[in-house]
Amino acid sequence: MTDEEQIGAIIDEMYAMISGPAGPRDWSRQANCFLPEARQARTWVDDEGRPQMLAMGLDDYQANTTPFFMANDFYEVETSRRIDLFGNIAHVWSGYEARTSPDAADVERRGINSIQLFRHADLGWRILAMVWDNER
C-alpha cells in the first residue's frame, strides 16, 4: 500500500469511528487512527464574533463528545481530501458534511479538518494533531 493509501485508510477509519446512530462509539478504534499523545481542537466563533478553541487529548475528546453521540444520529461524510507528504510527516485537508444519516439530503453543517500525521516506526501513519472549523 502506498503512503497515500495508508493515510487515506486512517482518515476513513477516523470518520467511521465517530459516525453512527445515536448511542455509544467504539473508542478502542482511536488506537487505529491516533497516536496516544494526539491533540484535537474544535474551533468556533462566539456570539461576539471572536474566534474560540477547545483543545483536547483523546480522553477529553471522548468525554466532550459522548453525550452528543449518545443522544444524536451523527454521520460525518468526507466531501474532499488533499494529502501533502514530506518524509515522515503528512498533512491532510479533509472537507466534511455532518448529517443525521450517510445519505440524508439535509446537511447540518459543513467544514474542514486540518489533520497532521506522523509515520511512527512501529505503528505506521497515525494522527498527531487535528483541528477543525465549520462553515459560517
What are these regions (language model features)?
Residues 8, 12, 59-62, 93:
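Generic alpha-helical structural signal
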Residues 91, 103, 108-136:
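Short beta-strand edge/turn micro-motifs at domain boundaries
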Residues 70-71, 98-108:
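Short, cysteine-centered beta-strand-loop-beta hairpins and adjacent loop/turn segments enriched
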Residues 1-36:
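Short, low-complexity N-terminal intrinsically disordered segments enriched in polar/charged residues
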Residues 16, 93-100:
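Generic short beta-strand segments
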Residues 27-86:
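A solvent-exposed, acidic/Ser-Thr-rich amphipathic alpha-helical stretch
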Residues 78-83, 96-98, 112-119:
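Hydrophobic/aromatic beta-strand elements that line small-molecule binding cavities or substrate pockets
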